[in-house]
A protein has these predicted regions:
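Hydrophobic membrane-insertion alpha-helices, especially the h-region
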Residues: 1-15
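Electrostatic cytochrome c docking/interface patches
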Residues: 19-40
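The canonical Cys-X-X-Cys-His
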Residues: 40-51, 102, 124
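Stable alpha-helical elements in mature extracytoplasmic
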Residues: 32-36, 43, 63, 67, ...
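C-terminal capping alpha-helices of c-type cytochrome domains
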Residues: 100-101, 108-133
């Protein structure tokens, strides 16, 4: 037990995952209406925008490492906060939502408001397809 606490304490010294940055929003995605924008914020923006709401567990290793990695990868793939109508990955995002890959189940287990119904997924897919550059 003591050894486990010592290891847990030592994990907190690893600096990766400490820094939680939300760069400025340059250009937000053009959602067709506020309801779809809210749906996207709930299901996508934690990892795919510069508007991440960093939960408490994202400050504690090893979860901080996983959350930081997910956000970095998500922003690299598709970032709704630096939207470029000519160069975006909306078609890939639509496919991922349609195939049930996004949002991932490991995320929706902790954030049930991001778990999309079939109708919500269809609405989000249609909006993403309409925004494809």
């Amino acid at each position: 037990m003591l050894a486990g606490l010592v290891v847990f304490g030592l994990l907190q010294l690893v600096p990766y995952g400490w820094w939680h940055e939300n760069p400025p929003v340059v250009a937000d995605a053009p959602w067709p209406d506020e309801a779809t924008a809210e749906l996207a914020r709930d299901a996508c923006y934690a990892c795919h925008s510069n508007e991440t709401d960093w939960p408490l567990y994202s400050y504690v290793a090893p979860m901080s490492w996983l959350v930081r990695q997910d956000v970095e990868r998500g922003r690299e793939e598709l970032n709704f906060s630096v939207w470029d109508p000519e160069d975006n990955e909306a078609d890939h995002a639509a496919d991922a939502v349609e195939d049930g890959e996004m949002p991932p189940s490991r995320y929706t287990r902790l954030h049930p408001d991001a778990d999309l119904s079939d109708a919500e997924a269809a609405r989000l897919v249609a909006a993403l397809e309409a925004m494809d550059g």
